From Swiss-Prot:
It is a single-pass membrane protein. F(1)F(0) ATP synthase produces ATP from ADP in the presence of a proton or sodium gradient. F-type ATPases consist of two structural domains, F(1) containing the extramembraneous catalytic core and F(0) containing the membrane proton channel, linked together by a central stalk and a peripheral stalk. During catalysis, ATP synthesis in the catalytic domain of F(1) is coupled via a rotary mechanism of the central stalk subunits to proton translocation. This is ATP synthase subunit b. HAMAP family: ATP_synth_b_bprime. Belongs to the ATPase B chain family. The gene is atpF. One of its GO terms (molecular function) is proton-transporting ATP synthase activity, rotational mechanism. F-type ATPases have 2 components, F(1) - the catalytic core - and F(0) - the membrane proton channel. F(1) has five subunits: alpha(3), beta(3), gamma(1), delta(1), epsilon(1). F(0) has three main subunits: a(1), b(2) and c(10-14). The alpha and beta chains form an alternating ring which encloses part of the gamma chain. F(1) is attached to F(0) by a central stalk formed by the gamma and epsilon chains, while a peripheral stalk is formed by the delta and b chains. It comes from Shewanella halifaxensis (strain HAW-EB4). NCBIfam families: ATP_synt_b, PRK05759.1-2, PRK05759.1-4. The keyword Cell inner membrane applies. It comes from the Bacteria.
């Protein structure tokens, strides 16, 4: 193998080509590759962050759902307590009203009883006076006197 000018020219041309590629072609290629690697790494990092954000959002949504259920249960419990309180108040009010009506009825009965007693006293007094008058008119006759008393007793 002989080294001639052609081989030497080809070697120099190859070295110039390598130098040119290293100087002008290789850096943009490396920059493009590095930029692509950076984009891929950023995309993977963003995907990881998105997955974490999704997980956090799911946890937060679960917590909010638990809080909402707890709040709903608390509201239902308060409503049930209020319902029981209203029912108890209505029972107490009804018992009070019933007692009031019963007391009013007893008072009316007592008033009617007193009125009837008073009427009866007046009638007894009138009968006693009438009997006394009749006895005085017939005071001589004992049999008539006893008959009048018996009639008074029967009328009472």
């Amino acid at each position: 193998m002989s080294i001639n000018a052609t081989l030497l020219g080809q070697a120099i041309s190859f070295l110039l080509f390598v130098w040119f590629c290293m100087k002008f072609v290789w850096p943009p290629l490396m920059n493009a590759i590095e930029e692509r690697q950076k984009k891929i790494a950023d995309g993977l990092a963003d995907a990881g962050r998105a997955a974490k954000d999704l997980e956090l959002a799911q946890v937060k949504a679960t917590e909010q759902l638990k809080d909402a259920k707890a709040t709903a249960n608390e509201i239902i419990e308060q409503a049930n307590k209020r319902k029981a309180q209203i029912v108890d108040e209505a029972k107490v009010e009804a018992d009070t009203e019933r007692a009031k009506i019963i007391a009013q009825g007893h008072a009316e009965i007592e008033n009617e009883r007193n009125r009837v007693k008073e009427d009866l006293r007046k009638q007894v007094a009138a009968l006693a006076i009438a009997g006394a008058e009749k006895i005085l008119e017939r005071s001589i006759d004992e049999a008539a006197h006893s008959d009048i008393v018996n009639k008074l007793v029967a009328e009472l």
